[in-house]
């Protein structure tokens, strides 16, 4: 009499199959986790570069509209100095044109006093409501970029670059802005000043 053996998996075969499945699942999970981490890092980098680009757009818009007009009571057309105006590095201040006032609806000029400074590792844009700020008038502060460890300026005039600007009677012809930004490094940009001589 022949006996029919039952066919099936042995305990050892089942354990081996479970171990292989667990190893494959763990590998797939680690790959997925790595992809998600890389995606998150890429998103952070894109966000940082977008913030950096936005800061340079503000600088370009302001430098492109510089006009040679000092504020009342001050003879300086253009102010740039280190460790002034509560800045941890360079600060800069000037008059710009082109502040939008559609059809003159708002009770203000199209001229605006603006400035930039580095404070608490943040690049800040300073703007004033009045063309000639009153004594004690606080600027409107807009944080353009965070985690900035350096804000450096150089000035171009008469065919050469200068590390400081002491000429109170005219504007530079160009400005180089260098920022040292966390997760990005040092970034420099050159800006052409359209009005290099007083009109």
Swiss-Prot record:
Signal peptide (UniProt feature, chain positions): none
Task: List UniProt keywords, sorted A-Z.
Answer: Cell inner membrane, Cell membrane, Membrane, Methylation, Transmembrane, Transmembrane helix
Localization, per the record, is:
Cell inner membrane
Q: Name one GO cellular component term.
A: plasma membrane
Per the UniProt record, one Pfam family is N_methyl
Q: Which residues form the propeptide?
A: 1-8
Which positions carry N-methylphenylalanine?
Answer: 9
Q: Which GO terms describe its biological process?
A: protein secretion by the type II secretion system
Q: Per UniProt, what is the membrane topology? A: Single-pass membrane protein
Domain of life (superkingdom) = Bacteria
PTM remark? Cleaved by prepilin peptidase.
Q: Where are the transmembrane segments?
A: 9-29
Matches recorded under SUPFAM superfamilies? Pili subunits
Q: What's the chief localization of this chain?
A: membrane
Answer whether the UniProt record assigns the keyword Cell inner membrane to this protein: yes
Null mutant: what phenotype? Deletion mutant shows longer pili but their number is reduced.
Q: Which family does it belong to?
A: Belongs to the GSP J family.
Q: Which PANTHER family match?
A: TYPE II SECRETION SYSTEM PROTEIN J, TYPE II SECRETION SYSTEM PROTEIN J-RELATED
Q: Which NCBIfam families match?
A: gspJ, IV_pilin_GFxxxE
**Assembly notes:** Type II secretion is composed of four main components: the outer membrane complex, the inner membrane complex, the cytoplasmic secretion ATPase and the periplasm-spanning pseudopilus. Interacts with core component PulG.
Query: What does this chain do?
Result: Component of the type II secretion system required for the energy-dependent secretion of extracellular factors such as proteases and toxins from the periplasm. Part of the pseudopilus tip complex that is critical for the recognition and binding of secretion substrates.
**Descriptive protein name:** Type II secretion system protein J
Q: Which organism is it from?
A: Klebsiella michiganensis (strain ATCC 8724 / DSM 4798 / JCM 20051 / NBRC 3318 / NRRL B-199 / KCTC 1686 / BUCSAV 143 / CCM 1901)
Classification from the root reads: Bacteria, Pseudomonadati, Pseudomonadota, Gammaproteobacteria, Enterobacterales
